[in-house]
Amino acid sequence: MKESIFSKKRILLLGSGELGKELVIESKRLGLEVIAIDRYEKAPAMQVADYSRVIDMGDKNILKNVIKEFNPDYVVPEIEALSIEALKELEDEGFNIVPNARTVEITMNRDKIRDLASKDLKIKTAKFDYIFEFDDLEKKADEIGFPLLLKPLMSSSGKGQSLVETKNDLQNAWKQAQANSRGKVKGVIIEEFINFDFEFTLLTVRKENGENIFCLPIGHLQSNGDYQCSWQPLEIKDSLIIEAKRMTSRILNNLNGAGLYGVEFFIKGSEVIFSELSPRPHDTGMVTLVSQNINEFELHLRAFLDLPIPHIYLIEPSATRVILSNQEYLNPIYEGLNEALEFEKTKVLIFGKPVSRKGRRMGVVLSSNSDIYLARKNADEAARKIKVSTT
C-alpha cells in the first residue's frame, strides 16, 4: 500500500494569530503535524497545534535554532515581524520557506513591494515616497498634497497608519508610525490619499506549475488600515476584474512562489490601482470559511503541498464583521453569544486571544444569505450583540 504523503509532513507556523489558527485546523484535517510559534503564550494557533514555542522571531539566531530543532518540511510565515535573514539562510540550507524567502522579504517591507509593482512592473499605484528623517517629511508632504497617508515601512493590520489632513498633523502621525514600526527599519512611506470609490481583495492561488487561480472578488471596509468587514461576491464590472487579474498575474509571475495571496486594489472610476499584497491567507478572506467550497486556508495548503485544486465556486453570498474589544482585559469573556447566534445561517468565531486591548480584533461573525445585503446586515447586527468583557 502506498504511504500517504502526509504521514510524516510537518509544518512550522511563524505567527500564531487567528489566521494561523484556521490554517492549523485545516492542516490537522489533512493529517499534518503542526508547530505554532509566536512571541506570546496561548496565542490562538497554539491552542490547536501539536506543539508550540514562545520566542523572539526577530532574533536571527533564536529563529534559526528553533526551526532546526523541529526540522519541519515547510516553514509557513503568518506575520511580518520576523528575521528575514534567518529565513534566507535556512532556505539556502534546504528548508522550504512558503512561498519563498524572497517573496516574504519583498512583501513584509512596503518599500520593496511598492518598488516592484510601480517601478519594475509599471503597475499603477498611489503616488508615494520614503522618508527616514522627520525634517524631510514636510517638504515631501507639500509635493504629494493633503490629505495623505503615513505608514510604517514595516507593520501589519494597519498599525501605525494615519490619515494626515494638514501639516499640523504630521508630527503626531510620524510618532505613531515610529511607535508601531516592526523590525529594525524605522522609515515611513508617505502616500497619496486616493478618494476611491471602493476597495477589494482578490484572493489568488499560485500553483507549483505557475498557474494562477482567482477567487471571486471580496469587498471590504477598513478603519485606519485595519479590516472591519468583508463580503463575497463583490459586484464589480468585468473590465475592472480583468485588469486586476492582469496586474496580479504580473506580480505573482515575478514572485513565483506557490501559495495563496491576498491582493488588494482600489477602484476609482475606470481605474484599477494596486494597494498591497500578502503572501498568505488574508483577513478579509475569512469570509471564505462559509462562502466558498474550498476556503482560503485549505487553498494555501493545497497550493504549497502541490495538491489538486478543483474548480473553486461560491456556495452562497456571505459576509463578515469583526468583534472588537473596547478595553484591556485579561482572560476576556464574551457576552451576547446567544443573541448573536439567533440569526439564520450565522456563525461566531472567537479567536481565543488571552488578552484584549482597545480596538483589538477578538473574533468575527460570518453570515450567509442568498441576498448579499441581508448577509452583510445579519453579520453586522450579530456582531453588535457581542461584547468583550471580564468576570
Swiss-Prot record:
ATP binds at R110, K151, S156, S157, G158, K159, G160, Q161, E191, E192, F193, I194, E199. Keywords: ATP-binding, Ligase, Magnesium, Metal-binding, Nucleotide-binding, Purine biosynthesis. Its EC number is 6.3.1.21. Mg(2+) binds at E264, E276. N(1)-(5-phospho-beta-D-ribosyl)glycinamide binds at E18, L19, E78, D283, K353, R360, R361. It catalyses: N(1)-(5-phospho-beta-D-ribosyl)glycinamide + formate + ATP = N(2)-formyl-N(1)-(5-phospho-beta-D-ribosyl)glycinamide + ADP + phosphate + H(+). It comes from the Bacteria. Gene3D superfamilies: 3.40.50.20, ATP-grasp fold, A domain, ATP-grasp fold, B domain. The keyword Coiled coil does not apply. Pathway: Purine metabolism; IMP biosynthesis via de novo pathway; N(2)-formyl-N(1)-(5-phospho-D-ribosyl)glycinamide from N(1)-(5-phospho-D-ribosyl)glycinamide (formate route): step 1/1. Belongs to the PurK/PurT family. PANTHER family: FORMATE-DEPENDENT PHOSPHORIBOSYLGLYCINAMIDE FORMYLTRANSFERASE. This is Formate-dependent phosphoribosylglycinamide formyltransferase.
